[in-house]
Amino acid sequence: MSKQLGQKIAPTPISNDINVVDLIDQYFTAYNSARLREICQLLSRDVLTEGVTVGVSLSGAMTPAGFGVSALAPLIRNGFIDWMISTGANLYHDMHYGLGFELFAGNPFLDDVKLRQEGTIRIYDIIFGYDVLLETDAFIRKILQGEAFQKRMGTAEFHYLLGKYVREVEKQLGVQHSCLLATAYEYGVPIYTSSPGDSSIGMNVAALALEGSQLVLDPSIDVNETAAIAYNARESGGKSAAVILGGGSPKNFLLQTQPQLHEVLGLEERGHDYFVQFTDARPDTGGLSGATPSEAVSWGKIDPEELPNTIVCYTDSTIALPLVTAYVLNKCQPRPLKRIYDKREAILDKLQKDYLAAKTQPSDQVPAAVAESAQKQTATYPCGRLIPNT
């Protein structure tokens, strides 16, 4: 008998009064259902504890389906999401709900030529009026003309201000369940966009630039702030978790915080402590969306000692997210809010000081093992530290 046996599969009939926790724990026994169960259990047991900083990346058309309101916002309110990377499209379509616009369930087999003639937009099996886009655009352009937006800023500050205005509209409309942007604003959760020009929000920013707007979204601010968040998670004695919904650019932007710290800044080399992903992308095509945790170890994105705490579930995020949300909301106590948005400047200042200190570090403070081989090595990190021979 193999020594690698796990828990015995002992199926019993599903009852008519089962709750979501028991359903997942007892009946998600194999294949990707088992990976989903393992993720739920890892989150509830280890990740959603007070000492872990949880970053979430969001790609795919999740918010048009309502998951910003139904799943992500409740996770934020319970302290289970500390910071996020999202596509701009997800944040744009999330605003429709906050502004009181209507989206409808359709089907993927409608006549798209006829829909275009009728002024109807389709996102697979979601449909809504073209006027929803126009009115959302008009709202964005109106508030972006305000004085608060007339400067260079990162996308966290930009989305914080957007969320502030959306929240005011929600209050006026009597919206009971806030959208993702408004909730993140209220709970101090910074949301970054890895490619701010790649969405209708970015398109409206670009249009206003033609009119003389001084708003500039600076990606360097985002790269440094997100690296500072990952750095602070460790410097404060805690751990860092990456929860990835889909893949794409948001996934990389979340994971690249670690190479930014060790490869570029030369400050540390560990990687994130926890990595869970829901994806339908294959690893054998070489794309980032399907890249495995073990591959990420080779880049220094994941701590190799924490590989047992990395799980990939190959499934649709629209199936996994509501199940995982229901599981942890029923299983876990709310965590104290970190309100990382309010601490951005302080943690970035700490990162900058440590980087500059390392860059100008006197030779007598260089570790002995490195100093002894200094003459044999020429390659250095940008901060000036020697890169060890491999």
Curated annotation (Swiss-Prot):
GO molecular function per UniProt: deoxyhypusine synthase activity
Keywords for the protein's UniProt record, in alphabetical order: Transferase
Lineage: Bacteria, Bacillati, Cyanobacteriota, Cyanophyceae, Nostocales
Matching Gene3D superfamilies: Deoxyhypusine synthase
Enzyme class (EC, first level): transferase
InterPro entries per record: Deoxyhypusine_synthase, Deoxyhypusine_synthase-like, Deoxyhypusine_synthase_sf, DHS-like_NAD/FAD-binding_dom
Gene source species: Nostoc punctiforme (strain ATCC 29133 / PCC 73102)
Name this polypeptide is given: Deoxyhypusine synthase-like protein
EC number(s) from the headed UniProt entry: 2.5.-.-
Family named by the database record: Belongs to the deoxyhypusine synthase family.
GO cellular component: cytoplasm
